[in-house]
Amino acid sequence: MINSQNTLYLQTKPYWDYLRIEKQASQHTLSNYQRQLLAVSDMLSQAGISTWQEVNSATVRWIIAQSNKQGLGAKSIALRLVALRQWFSYLIRQEKMSVNPAVGIKAPKASKRLPKNIDAEQIGQLLTSDSHEPSDLRDLAMMELMYSSGLRLSELQGLDLGDMDLAGREVRLLGKGNKERIVPIGSKALEALNRWLAVRNQFKPQDNAVFLNKRGGRLSHRSIQLVMQKWGEKQGLESHLHPHKLRHSFATHMLEASGDLRAVQELLGHSNLATTQIYTHLDFQHLAKIYDAAHPRAKRKKQDDD
């Protein structure tokens, strides 16, 4: 059990007042830093270190190694390192240290997880609905649009009526970094949107948001996440449904069908092609079968190669 009364952690008390009052740090930042420095203080105390001035770059590397051994993820270790850097910077400003031992030390890189996607059969199961309830028409339209056009959750949530050109079958999106892009709307999504917009006024709109809550206001990010989760459960989807999964499925299916990485990059609004390239690793068996069938020198012999 971590001891919050250890000498090292007690030395950090003025730092929290400094962050709260002078730096106006959020409670979220304070809680994160406090949790990290408490854990490090305990680790160092058990190693016989009683002052922060005893910590050098070798000690910081040891902290990272110990954190890794304890099963801490790469992102958590990176946060721990940031908390240490900021704490040592404070001690330098207070003239209690002359060198920041955490500067120049890198946290381990997080392994890139392949996005999970829903296969075409499951998409059909998910997006099949005979309900005429206004809220169901809204929910189906959201999911059809996200899968049809690869929207981010923030893009879907921020969508206004003026952003859509239904006659031209396209939608204008404001993505990360306020970058604007225009993407096409598929026929199924267009049908679902028209059905929803026909009943949208029943929600007594308070603004121009495309997707409204029952009070007529814009649906929140969290509400959209909950709507999709419940819809997935209702439709019998085995895995947990969240907005990113629909975007990932759009990207995967588009890439499998077209093989055009640049086009998928444009549709997703990725500024860096490397971000899109993660989808090239998806469904390797599917791609390998295409390669075996198409490449003239890909015919594999049953016997072992020498």
Swiss-Prot record:
GO CC annotation terms, alphabetical: cytoplasm
Keyword Cell division: yes
Example GO BP: cell division
Tyr recombinase domain location: 113-292
Active site, UniProt feature: R152, K176, H244, R247, H270, Y279 (o-(3'-phospho-dna)-tyrosine intermediate)
Keywords: Cell cycle, Cell division, Chromosome partition, Cytoplasm, DNA integration, DNA recombination, DNA-binding
Example GO molecular function: tyrosine-based site-specific recombinase activity
UniProt keyword Nucleotide-binding present: no
CDD domains assigned to the protein according to its UniProt record, in alphabetical order: INT_XerDC_C (cd00798)
Family from the record: Belongs to the 'phage' integrase family. XerC subfamily.
Subunit-structure text: Forms a cyclic heterotetrameric complex composed of two molecules of XerC and two molecules of XerD.
PANTHER family named in the record: PHAGE INTEGRASE-RELATED, TYROSINE RECOMBINASE XERC
Protein name (Swiss-Prot/TrEMBL): Tyrosine recombinase XerC
Annotated source species: Actinobacillus pleuropneumoniae serotype 7 (strain AP76)
Lineage, broadest ranks: Bacteria, Pseudomonadati, Pseudomonadota, Gammaproteobacteria, Pasteurellales
